[in-house]
């Protein structure tokens, strides 16, 4: 805590130190469906989550086998943007791929 003299009346003010907490983090999750090709899921993971082909394939297999796969953990704004980008791309390509974000 810093002590700051007040030049007007000679009183001393104490500056409150602000405690900043880290931002909340969110998982971006792909959900399985019976129609989106596996290769499309791999491409999405590579393109939007900057994963190499091997990692993207592992995420795709997790989605396929377990019904869901985490692509990454991000701050709220970044996670929301990635979800929107993935869903938009999937719809433009004619696929029903679902992408959601959940608190980490």
From Swiss-Prot:
Pfam families: ClpS. InterPro entries: ClpS (IPR022935), ClpS_core (IPR003769), Ribosomal_bL12_C/ClpS-like (IPR014719). It comes from the Bacteria. One of its GO terms (biological process) is protein catabolic process. HAMAP family: ClpS. Belongs to the ClpS family. Binds to the N-terminal domain of the chaperone ClpA. Involved in the modulation of the specificity of the ClpAP-mediated ATP-dependent protein degradation. This is ATP-dependent Clp protease adapter protein ClpS. It comes from Paraburkholderia phytofirmans (strain DSM 17436 / LMG 22146 / PsJN) (Burkholderia phytofirmans). The gene is clpS.
């Amino acid at each position: 805590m810093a002590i700051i003299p007040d030049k007007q009346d000679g009183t001393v003010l104490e500056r409150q130190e602000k405690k900043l907490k880290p931002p909340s983090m969110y998982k971006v999750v792909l959900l399985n469906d019976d129609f989106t090709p596996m290769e499309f899921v791999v491409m999405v993971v590579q393109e939007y989550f900057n994963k190499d082909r091997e990692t993207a394939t592992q995420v795709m297999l997790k989605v396929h086998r377990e019904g869901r796969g985490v692509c990454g953990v991000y701050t709220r704004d970044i996670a929301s943007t990635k979800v929107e980008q993935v869903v938009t791309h999937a719809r433009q390509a004619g696929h029903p791929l679902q992408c959601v974000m959940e608190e980490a």
